[in-house]
Amino acid sequence: MGSLSNYSPVMEDVQAIRKAQKADGTATVMAIGTAHPPHIFPQDTYADFYFRATNSEHKVELKKKFDRICKKTMIGKRYFNYDEEFLKKYPNITSFDEPSLNDRQDICVPGVPALGAEAAVKAIAEWGRPKSEITHLVFCTSCGVDMPSADFQCAKLLGLRTNVNKYCVYMQGCYAGGTVMRYAKDLAENNRGARVLVVCAELTIIGLRGPNESHLDNAIGNSLFGDGAAALIVGSDPIIGVERPMFEIVCAKQTVIPNSEDVIHLHMREAGLMFYMSKDSPETISNNVEACLVDVFKSVGMTPPEDWNSLFWIPHPGGRAILDQVEARLKLRPEKFGATRTVLWDCGNMVSACVLYILDEMRRKSVADGLATYGEGLEWGVLLGFGPGMTVETILLHSLPPV
């Protein structure tokens, strides 16, 4: 019997192996699951809670300003993994800049994979196949950096097989929901039979802090961000009658907007994650988004549509002003961002998990309304992630009919 050391495969053998490794079809989204922590906070009374919980009620004028900011966000409520009683145990967290990273880490390190696992369980149940058939796990979060990392902890909580291929995407921010879909596409299409579990989970306590007159960026962040997790099952060549594909991930591209690094940036300090956001962020995004859209269409040999209203839209809701300016720049009808504005109203900005929530909202409403596709009855659409860098993720989607 010959040994492998004496065997020299010819190029045709390698090409045949490579061809056999690849899937035949495009990556598809087959299932979606979401999860919230238990505590719900109405936005119209959030200023009262926030200033009380941070022992800042004496800052009367700052509270009035923060309340006005909250009421302009177009957010109705948000979910958090903490309540006032919980925060009272951590005066260092509710201060503005006292050392608190150890306590924040102790909350986030177990909390992030646990919340992500809740969303994953729902996605796996909807998918309808055994969890042992999951071949890859992509886990994304902007908090709780640790080793073993959150992907390991989530896989352990779910009881995934020990040889699942894991990937952890840390500290990418609000564009990362698009990033993980790009990764999932490459994994599914380059590994025949792969089923990729994608999980995004975010907890805002990594950056929660008391108000400060000299750092209003902090007030904006505290008015926008909420906790949540979302999960997808992504795979190519769906099994007919067993798996139900909803969206084909046709193309996924990332673009860094030149000279925009200071528009949105965050920094981990002993006092937790510090948030900085320029007033120029809506204009920076809206001035560059059309070029990203044109690029993704041309990269697959398609002519960009003359009217952007012919597509369905899943933009990340970085905030009301960003949505308003992108909508105006692309001359979109108000209803085109309907799914995004619904999620923003119901949950706030959940960082990387947000666009996956919007995907879920769109497909559910499309089915409820009896439309021809999961994408509001339209075939083609785009998912957009915006975040630090400034970085834009542009995902071209093809929507399929409900089964």
Swiss-Prot record:
Subunit structure: Homodimer.
Marked site: Determines the polyketide chain length and product specificity: G207
Gene behind this protein: PKS4
Recorded metabolic or biological pathway in which this protein acts: Secondary metabolite biosynthesis; flavonoid biosynthesis
Enzyme Commission designation: 2.3.1.-
Residues annotated as the enzyme's active site: C174
Domain of life: Eukaryota
InterPro entries reported for this sequence: Chalcone/stilbene_synt_C, Chalcone/stilbene_synt_N, Polyketide_synthase_type-III, Thiolase-like
Summary of the function given for this chain in its UniProt record: Catalyzes the iterative condensations of 8 molecules of malonyl-CoA to produce aromatic octaketides, SEK4 and SEK4b, the products of the minimal polyketide synthase for the benzoisochromanequinone actinorhodin. May be involved in the biosynthesis of the octaketide barbaloin.
Keywords: Acyltransferase, Flavonoid biosynthesis, Transferase
GO biological process: flavonoid biosynthetic process; polyketide biosynthetic process
Note: A.arborescens is a medicinal plant rich in aromatic polyketides, such as pharmaceutically important aloenin (hexaketide), aloesin (heptaketide) and barbaloin (octaketide).
Protein's UniProt name: Octaketide synthase 2
Origin organism lineage: Eukaryota, Viridiplantae, Streptophyta, Embryophyta, Tracheophyta
Binding site for CoA: S281, G318, G319, R320, A321
UniProt enzyme class: transferase
GO molecular function: acyltransferase activity, transferring groups other than amino-acyl groups
Similarity-based family: Belongs to the thiolase-like superfamily. Chalcone/stilbene synthases family.
